[in-house]
Amino acid sequence: MGSTGKIKIGINGFGRIGRLVARVALTRDDIELVGVNDPFISTDYMSYMFKYDSVHGKWKHHEVNVKDSKTLLFGEKSVAVFGCRNPEEIPWGEVGAEYVVESTGVFTDKEKASAHLKAGAKKVVISAPSKDAPMFVVGVNEHQYKSDVNIVSNASCTTNCLAPLAKVINDKFGIVEGLMTTVHSITATQKTVDGPSNKDWRGGRGAGFNIIPSSTGAAKAVGKVLPALNGKLTGMAFRVPTPDVSVVDLTVRLEKSATYDEIKAAIKAESEGNLKGILGYTEDAVVSTDFIGDSRSSIFDAQAGIALSDNFVKLVSWYDNEWGYSSRVVDLIVHMAATQ
């Protein structure tokens, strides 16, 4: 905690998630953004990219100005700007950044992310799945966080959508096995026109005019945050030409028989109780753009799901894969700070 009583955070990587985490942080009273690092973006360009957003609209909360080449002003609040390629060299200690959001997509394992600790940070939250850092999904397993753990992963946006839904269903009815499909909006790694993508040939095809089948580790990752479901879920993705908001289709076999109405009631109860603000519930005739700017991780679409029998059901849940996820990154930091 800083002298202001606020949690001081830094952001490494000012891409989609980095900028939106900054937006979330700057609208909250319990967080203070003290520094941003990105070696590829100048300070004046940073200001422009923060201010104007094709999906989430122009920033309306306060003026954003460049004080000098190393400082941005958000209203009266000055934020230090760095351009270090090596995270070890970012002066987090000097600006007092206790928690660093690692959102470059590059330093996603414990060894690489630990460079921020050497630079003076106390904790690191990786805004991506990690092969070896413990993964936490707020609303699902964040209570298992121990204060001596310094590097954590906030999992993926899709895992954050799927896990709360899977938790409710497994707790109430038991999941024998399940398959997930996410119909997922385009992301920065995709191509505007056909281009080279050696690891994933389909992923190199033009994002704006194709439905592109893709792999995702999101369903398997649920088994890491909910060990009871380990080995019971897997899934895949279709990348589609929408700029933001995605939707999970979870098809599961249940241990206990349940009508679709009983399943809806269980999800609705949790959305108003333990998972309020994380899991949503709607019976409206919604479409994807209705969820742009929705800060919840997962919004269950009661009308869209369907049961084949009392043991076999398809469940549909929406998520703003940018804004909802960025909101959870900040929530996880607040939770971690509360356990210190």
From Swiss-Prot:
Entry binding sites for NAD(+): 16-17, 38, 85, 321
A Pfam family the protein falls into: Gp_dh_C
Name of the protein in question: Glyceraldehyde-3-phosphate dehydrogenase, cytosolic
Keyword tags: Cytoplasm, Glycolysis, NAD, Oxidoreductase
Record's keyword annotation contains Cytoplasm: yes
Keyword Translocase: no
Annotated GO biological process: glucose metabolic process; glycolytic process
Something else known: Plants contain two types of GAPDH: cytosolic forms which participate in glycolysis and chloroplast forms which participate in photosynthesis. All the forms are encoded by distinct genes.
Native organism: Pinus sylvestris
Function statement: Key enzyme in glycolysis that catalyzes the first step of the pathway by converting D-glyceraldehyde 3-phosphate (G3P) into 3-phospho-D-glyceroyl phosphate. Essential for the maintenance of cellular ATP levels and carbohydrate metabolism.
Disulfide bonds: none
Entry annotation: catalytic residues: 157 (nucleophile)
GO molecular function: glyceraldehyde-3-phosphate dehydrogenase (NAD+) (phosphorylating) activity; NAD binding; NADP binding
Subunit structure: Homotetramer.
GO cellular-component term (any): cytosol
Family as reported in the entry's similarity comment: Belongs to the glyceraldehyde-3-phosphate dehydrogenase family.
Residues carrying the site annotation Activates thiol group during catalysis: 184
Matches recorded under InterPro entries: GlycerAld/Erythrose_P_DH, GlycerAld_3-P_DH_AS, GlycerAld_3-P_DH_cat, GlycerAld_3-P_DH_NAD(P)-bd, Glyceraldehyde-3-P_DH_1, NAD(P)-bd_dom_sf
Compartments where found: Cytoplasm
Main location: cytoplasm
Transmembrane intervals: none
EC number: 1.2.1.12
Pathway(s) per entry: Carbohydrate degradation; glycolysis; pyruvate from D-glyceraldehyde 3-phosphate: step 1/5
